[in-house]
Amino acid sequence: MLKVLLYDGGMKLAGKSGVGRAMEHQARALQNAGIPYTHDPGEDYNIVQLNTVFPNSLWMGMKARMQGKKVVYYGHSTMEDFRNSFTGSNLAAGLFKRWIKRCYESGDVIITPTPYSARLLNTYGLRKPVVALSNGIDLAAYKRSEEGARRFREAYCFTESRKVVLGVGHYIERKGILDFVEMAKWYPQYDFIWFGSTPSALIPAKIRKAVRTQLPNLQFPGFVGKEELMDAYSGSDLFFFPTLEETEGIVMLEAMAMETPVLTRDIPVYEGWLEHGRTVYKGRGQEDFARLLPDILEGRLPRLTEEAYRLVQENSITKIGDALAGIYEGLFAEEKAESKNLQLL
């Protein structure tokens, strides 16, 4: 009987990131598909699913292979999205690429969230198949709530008349945090709030300075849990995500599911998926953001949330669970075919 080990080694470090949320989504997807899973390596299982690139995940994959189990490795990270992140990340990017290549090749199959990230990984010369499959979104859980909106605005002292711009992510340059702060300076009539956190030792000096910016309309409250973040989506007038590089961006799926208008950067991962002026608004830099942001907030541009919600339904947890089941079946079908060929020799 099929059973999956969702290995959670490294989650103490990655649990507050998109990888942590991705693991939650995988568990829900397997549950919806009726596929048994466990987080306990001591239980019986025949597939291990790995999500981090810490040494313990590589070790777990190698151990599972030695025991004849199948290994599914999620390619959440690329060299490209490692750059412009933590202190020293640009200097270490080449080493990071070699390391993640070693990790990913320990799997029987590599799953990565988008066709864009699959194309990137395929340029690394990986010797294992790479499959594009969204991290997914639990549409039953992510529902816009008037009560949640009220809680959020009361908690952060936003009046009903003020427009609120929401940002979510680590305190890293890649997430576009510098542009977020700059827009807060340009538009004092709007409130800006960014949820997320990063250990201070890993934050580059210019990002640390940006987060300490003192403006009456700018807040950095730190990390919040899923429920409070859903309240924030419900109570915000715009999700501003000026990220410079993503493999998908789970927060993008969350905002679309919560029917919060989205303004993001026009980057390759969203080409052919998120259409400017149809599902989201996209800008190339501060000049575009400065023009689009007030037009969205003041209703001078059409509200796109209905079309965005229709699109994000393609990323539903139910569909992701069915797709995972197909990937698992393919792994064992290959094993049976190889066994049959050996018997014929």
Language-model regions, residue ranges each:
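Glycosyltransferase donor-sugar binding loop
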Residues: V168, D191-K206
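Short hydrophobic beta-strand element within catalytic cores of glycosyltransferases
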Residues: P261-T264
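Nucleotide-activated donor-binding/catalytic signature segment of Leloir-type glycosyltransferases, i.e.
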Residues: A205-E227
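Conserved donor-binding/catalytic core segment of Leloir-type glycosyltransferases
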Residues: F158-K175, V181-K185, I193
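Conserved acidic donor-binding segment of nucleotide-sugar-dependent glycosyltransferases
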Residues: H276-E287, P294-R300
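Aromatic "clamp/platform" in nucleotide-sugar-dependent glycosyltransferases that forms part
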Residues: L244
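Short alpha-helical donor nucleotide-sugar binding micro-motif in glycosyltransferases
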Residues: Y104, F223-V224, D231-S236
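Membrane-proximal helix-turn-helix segments that form the acceptor-binding/catalytic region
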Residues: L91-I110
